Design a protein with these regions (language model features):
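N-terminal amphipathic/basic-hydrophobic helices that include classical n-h-c signal peptides
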Residues: 1-8, 116
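Active-site and donor-binding regions of nucleotide-sugar-utilizing enzymes
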Residues: 26-134
Length: 134
């Protein structure tokens, strides 16, 4: 019981710090966007403001371009194995986004991974309603 309480407190503290840092995280993306516009162009995706996806989704998250390249074999197999699903690949950087879009064009969907805050993640998951998450 005490362990559950401590885990709950840790998540609460983590979320509180996240909420306090959110303006700084957004400002950082806006500043980075001065040099690389892609950082600011889709900032609302990171806040969970995305359109509802009405088809079954398989969600694959790749932090880096290297992870994406390593995952292409898996993604290709998922496309073949689940023809009635759309694949959503999320990344955290514009270079990751560019790699996904160049490799798959419109064959898969791409979004930026959301900020790790409860209301953001809940909204994001509600909008994509994934059947499978990897």
């Amino acid at each position: 019981m005490r362990v559950l309480y401590l885990l709950s407190m840790n998540r609460t503290l983590y979320s509180l710090v996240g909420y306090l840092l959110l303006p700084i995280m957004v400002l950082r993306l806006l500043i980075k966007g001065l040099k690389t516009p892609a950082y600011r162009q889709r900032i609302f995706e990171r806040l969970g403001f995305i359109s509802k996806i009405p088809v079954p989704i398989i969600w694959v998250h790749c932090v880096s371009v290297g992870e994406f390249r390593a995952a292409t074999v898996l993604i290709d197999q998922l496309i073949k194995s689940y023809p009635d699903h759309r694949l959503l690949v999320t990344t955290t950087t514009p270079t990751g986004s560019q790699a996904v879009l160049e490799h798959y064009q419109s064959e898969v969907l791409h979004l930026y991974f959301p900020f790790d805050l409860p209301w953001v993640v809940n909204r994001y998951i509600k909008q994509i309603n994934p059947a499978i998450c990897l």
